[in-house]
From Swiss-Prot:
Residue numbers with lipid attached (N-palmitoyl cysteine): C16
Family, similarity comment: Belongs to the transglycosylase Slt family.
Lipid-substituted positions (S-diacylglycerol cysteine): C16
Catalytic activity: Endolytic cleavage of the (1->4)-beta-glycosidic linkage between N-acetylmuramic acid (MurNAc) and N-acetylglucosamine (GlcNAc) residues in peptidoglycan with concomitant formation of a 1,6-anhydrobond in the MurNAc residue
Chief location category: membrane
Protein name as catalogued: Endo-type membrane-bound lytic murein transglycosylase A
Amino acid sequence: MKLRWLLILVVFLAGCSSKHDYTNPPWNPEVPVKRAMQWMPISEKAGAAWGVDPQLITAIIAIESGGNPAVVSKSGAVGLMQLKPSTSGRDVYRRMGWRGEPSVSELKNPERNISMGAAYLSILENGPLAGIKDPQVMRYAVVVSYANGAGALLRTFSSDRQDAIDEINDLDADEFFEHVVKKHPAPQAPRYIWKLQKALDAM
């Protein structure tokens, strides 16, 4: 009986440790970044229009699609920056004062996809994440929100948005990352920050 409980404990602890192993499976950014860099002229134009760092846009392209504009995920995310028509796409349309949502063919167009992706990053930074003071913390918060939603991130701090922002402002970038590792319900969240940094370092 003791042996059985020992085995259960070992399995449980192994599961806990693997939950936060955001470095597995390994990810080599070299090829995805190289392919994403071919879209840099468009990323620079979109970044200038929306006040978004084109290197951040390029890193997200590398992570999301590896630079392939025709990719459609199982969840329905489309194109270089893997935008979902009914969520991020609809948010951008609303921000532009347009009705409806973008079509799949529109999101497969590199210029339209990157423009809308940059717009969505701006919406996150100037909307639910507005008030975060540290630029590196903001960058981490933006990409986690891009991948998993701003609400999911803010709720790991507080159910009140302003209280959550205040708590975030008490952290530096490393402390914010550790919080995401420990508190965010999506294993993808810390992994996204890790991949972002690897992509930026590879540029």
